[in-house]
Amino acid sequence: MARSRSIKLIKWLLQLAALLTIGAAAALAYLWLQQEDWLPEPSKPFAAALGQPQPLPASDYRIDLLAADDLAFRLQKAVIEARPGTLIVLPEGRFEFNDELIINQPNITLAGQGMFKTTLDFTNQASGAQGILGLGDALRIQDLAVVNAPGDGIKTEGINHLLIQRTRVAWENGPSPLNGAYGLYPVQSKNIVIEDSHVSGASDAGIYVGQSSNIVVRRNTVEYNVAGIEIENSIFADVYDNWAAYNTAGILVFDLPNLPVYGGRNTRVFNNVVFDNSTKNFAPEGNIVGIVPSGTGLMVMANDEIEIFGNLVRNHGTASLVVVSYLVTEIPVTDANYEPYPESLWVHHNRFENPDRWYLDGSDFNLLPNLLFDMDPPEIIVDGITKTYHTQAEADAGQSCFAHNTNANQGPIRVGSMNLASGNTNLLGLPSGPALYNEPQYDCQGKSSPEIAIDTWPNAVQTQANNQQLELCKTTMDGINWQAIEADCPNLEDYGLTASLGYTYDLQTPLFSDYMEKQRTIYLPANSSLAYTASGPLKAPIGTIISKTFVNPSSQKAVETRLLIHRQSGWVGLPYLWNNGIAKLHVGGALIPQSINLEGKRIDWHYQVPNQNQCDSCHKQGKQFQPIGLATKWLNHSNQLQQLEDKGWLTELPEDPNQRPLVAAWDDTNNNNLPQRARAYLDINCGHCHNPAGLAHTSGLALKAELPMSTKTGVCKPPVAAGRGAGDLSYAIVPGEAESSILHLRMGSLDPAIKMPELSKGLVHQQGLALIKQWINQMPGTCEQL
């Protein structure tokens, strides 16, 4: 980062020289220039009435919730119990939430009374990284507001068909690096429509669509975010008729490396009003959007086949449009399949209107073009790392076309190249161009992307009502009630589970759960068995039940029991809460006051019992729910595998023990292989999400123990969509520097916007944190060598 340090030095020298040589009069003149009037605010590109509530959509089932203090709990319970095709209607009012709302069922509609009438307030949220998390296909959210979420406002992941309309997401304290990262955040989803919505205060992007396809973003108001709208690593998007004003930057189209989905292309940005995006960048350090200077209208980074037309882009002091390679970030590219250069842009028939005045915001990227263009940057700036735009009517493949764009005086705009490919530098090591201009307007013709066609909304698949299944819970027989496995029984005792009828086991390295002791038991139907697998969970027959009871180690009282039941339709998780010796189904989750004595010290906290939908957050691999601990590598200790085989409960076990996968015990201090212990700990605690099929795979960080160490496993990996979770740090793991590593930071935090794991973490595992710290500090190499 020598160039960044040089830029900071030249900024300081220039400011000092201005004060010493020009004096107070020049300083006053500079302040006057900064304050002078801009061009007037234009009209919005849509009618205000579009944001008003509309008639509710047709639905197969409807749940109307009444206003009360416990609405958050009743809403989560309603979402869990809803059948596909259900409309859930929220009342007018402001309601507090201390946990995220997860929607797993497909074909659910969540509707309020209006974006300024129904408000879900997440100011005091203690668990979960977003306000609302949508994981079910065909999700519709409308006519409500989500405010003050510590992480993202509304996030969806891996779903097909999303409609968000007339929805408001806001951080009510105004622009701040302490705000959540994204307002509306679909990722790895398709057939997305976001319309007539408002987002303000996001510390990354107001509307952010990542790693997705078939996207329409229209008629939205995005103000006072870092980026108003960002389309990242996505294909086939239409962004039009939006009002993007008073952000740091209006609209971004980016493509980044080291992600599961890359190669962004075919985005159309048209008929938007992009106005006065001059708010100082307030993104937490370490996030890629933090490099974007204020005074930026539009920016394209490393994306291909982008068409930008019909936009009014007014009052931007840095540039109306910036087109750059990812290389300008100075972050090393370690992804061999990633193409860092933008190609084949067609920018035409836009109005780029900027006043003739200086604009300095104090950022590195704002200073550089001012130096190269003698304090008079053109409307369009390209980095010049490659020959990116036409200089004649006939163009080479991959070049971009800038044609028929006008400035504030209805004249032709200027296109300027910073000519970074020249390699020329000045005495301070800064790029010195020389800057190049492409003044003439060639009548070039670019490639137009197709209009986005959203697929037909799917019909809901009908399911059996739960009250019909509850009859299965009633039995007078002794032993396990096998007929009840298809029902969510209200009482744990309805299943007839006793430890003597199953096999009790432990894991080589267990997942940390606030120091709770765990009692694990597996039950198999008669004449059935598990089948060995070298990777992933053992193959379990239909009817398998896994019971895990969490016990306070000090009081020795059971707090909760979680069941995993393998039904005909797949695995399902059920949480049961203990009270006075009876365990009852509690699908909505709970916070339970607990106390333990740890190393002679009393610790008090609220233990989180997850709601039923939160089971999916850890156990879902793609669309398939799976057990985590029921895998050979975790069971392979204390002769457990052999005992299961001898019992007739495990088949296909390799005779040679050396052929059975084995991981280290994280707390085995007699094992001198520190990396094995640390990576086993990360695998069981983080790897169920951080793997190519887990919920966190969109981050590009994989933490399975068997993977070779690389950027993908965190070494010198920049954060993606981390928000405050980046902690002003640059990489997940910095060899030799645990305190500079995002991984260590997040493990040691209880802040819901930062902590990892996100769920069921009320205490920091100090012993596990110390293990990871020791491992990172002994790791060879540096990130600078990249």
Please name every model-derived segment.
Residues 75-81, 96-105, 110, 121, ...:
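Short, T/G/N/S-enriched strand-turn elements that build extracellular solenoid repeat scaffolds
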Residues 2-22:
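N-terminal Sec-pathway targeting helices
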Residues 75, 98, 122-133, 148-155, ...:
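Extracellular beta-strand/beta-solenoid scaffold signature
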Residues 466-474, 480, 537, 555-786:
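Sequence context surrounding c-type heme c attachment/ligation sites in exported
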Residues 60-89:
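Acidic Gly/Asp/Thr-rich repetitive segments characteristic of extracellular carbohydrate-active
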Residues 166, 241, 256, 271, ...:
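Extracellular beta-rich repeat passengers
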Residues 113-116, 137-148, 160-173, 190-205, ...:
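Right-handed parallel beta-helix
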Residues 64-73, 107-150, 173:
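Right-handed parallel beta-helix/beta-spiral solenoid domain characteristic of secreted/periplasmic
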